[in-house]
Amino acid sequence: MAFSVEEISSILPNSLSANPRNVSQNTISPSFFKPSLKPYASKTLISLSCRRSLSPVFSAGTYVTNVDEDDKLHEECGVVGIHGDPEASRLSYLALHALQHRGQEGAGIVAANQNGLESITGVGLVSDVFTESKLNNLPGDIAIGHVRYSTSGASMLKNVQPFIASCKLGSLAVAHNGNFVNYKQLKTKLEEMGSIFITSSDTELVLHLIAKSKAKTFLLRVIDACEKLRGAYSMVFVFEDKLIAVRDPFGFRPLVMGRRSNGAVVFASETCALDLIDATYEREVCPGEIVVVDRNHGDSSMFMISHPEQKQCVFEHGYFSQPNSIVFGRSVYETRRMYGEILATVAPVDCDVVIAVPDSGTVAALGYAAKAGVPFQIGLLRSHYAKRTFIEPTQEIRDFAVKVKLSPVRAVLEGKRVVVVDDSIVRGTTSLKIVRMLRDAGAKEVHMRIALPPMIASCYYGVDTPRSQELISSKMSVEAIQKHINCDSLAFLPLDSLKGVYGPVESHRYCYACFTGKYPVTKTESEEADAS
């Protein structure tokens, strides 16, 4: 079944255009950089044998948010892999739309066919990067895809995945969700051995480790590389006729496996991507597991050195993942609803209406309202057309940022005692503006309820978080934050209550480092100094 971009666009939100922007089109070809004869597609994006950097040949652009996005956490990326479907690239395109919330600054797809590995990558949304003509240049029944959110605020084309590289065994491609805490240490060692890094992405580290490995097969080289990596990684690889999925031994980031009716195997960061392409969810890729899919033997798996305790990111349930996904074996929707119900039990308040900060606070607010026996209403409207921009806004414009993104509904708020539920407070700037906005719209009282515990520490496992000292809860008490944002009361979901949602056994499988400062995998001293 073939899809055109026009057909695909017809089932997607109107806000997602299909206008290309900053897409890699191989307009420059140094002697060591051999492009495909087809337009828009390259066989080698990264050549590990080259002795000089490719960085001068790539364009770069800096995205700056003008809607206060810097006061929210950001998942760094989402991945998809498909094996055994003649429409693998188009299905990857659809799946990446479903994962767009995990990264909005870049997207890419690599397809394997008789010509080798061919890729299209670009800066912007999935619909900005791909058009019908570009997808036509990605034939093949194996493909991997990636959506990216950069940690530094700079989104450069050379950093957009998937990455393609050549080594002694042949060409390979990789897409990665996570973060390696020993990146700088390993990079320094590899550079001392002669490796030249082309990008500033830690994902490139994997390619160099595979290229340097002495193992005789590609799979053994992947295992060899993973044994050297510390931190979070859910990755998909393409090599020859194989699609390989890998998840770190702690299981920090999600990675699920599904199958289409024609037998095609699909890997994705969330089940919502499977749903969109009519793939049936089968299971998670287990922490420490490597799943190999090839044409001759179907799918098989093996395990690397496992860790006795999983440490899955609890923020996947609280904020990052789509409510219609199953993540870590649990419904995201039901888990968030339980957060809200417990929050209403431990932090009740007399009120007339419960509202949410959309979209991530909505399900918890529904749970809070149901448990409190108070009506839930839409008190804040979110504009989904407030996008990131290349224009550096002035401070005066930044002051209007929340108003651009959120609009109060006066008919719901005026004269009411309002409980407003959000998923988290990061720096506190957005919460301050929301409270002011609700009061300006006539709210008699404003009570903030946060569906996760206070954040006091940065995340090193694939989440773009501010430095610890920039987190308001790391330097202020709850009472001080309440006064700072000028609400009538403020309460967070206690950590013990959060763990209670999962029960005494399952709760030990989650990472709470951003709430406790206790990290399951620590950075080296030099890296911690750089991050502080």
UniProtKB/Swiss-Prot annotation:
GO terms for molecular function: amidophosphoribosyltransferase activity; iron-sulfur cluster binding; metal ion binding. One of its GO terms (cellular component) is chloroplast stroma. It holds the Pfam family Pribosyltran. The active site is at residue 77. Pathway: Purine metabolism; IMP biosynthesis via de novo pathway; N(1)-(5-phospho-D-ribosyl)glycinamide from 5-phospho-alpha-D-ribose 1-diphosphate: step 1/2. The keyword Glycosyltransferase applies. Its EC number is 2.4.2.14. InterPro entries: GATase_2_dom, Ntn_hydrolases_N, PRibTrfase_dom, PRTase-like, PurF, PurF_N. Residues 77-296 form the Glutamine amidotransferase type-2 domain. It is an enzyme of class 2 (transferase). This is Amidophosphoribosyltransferase 3, chloroplastic.
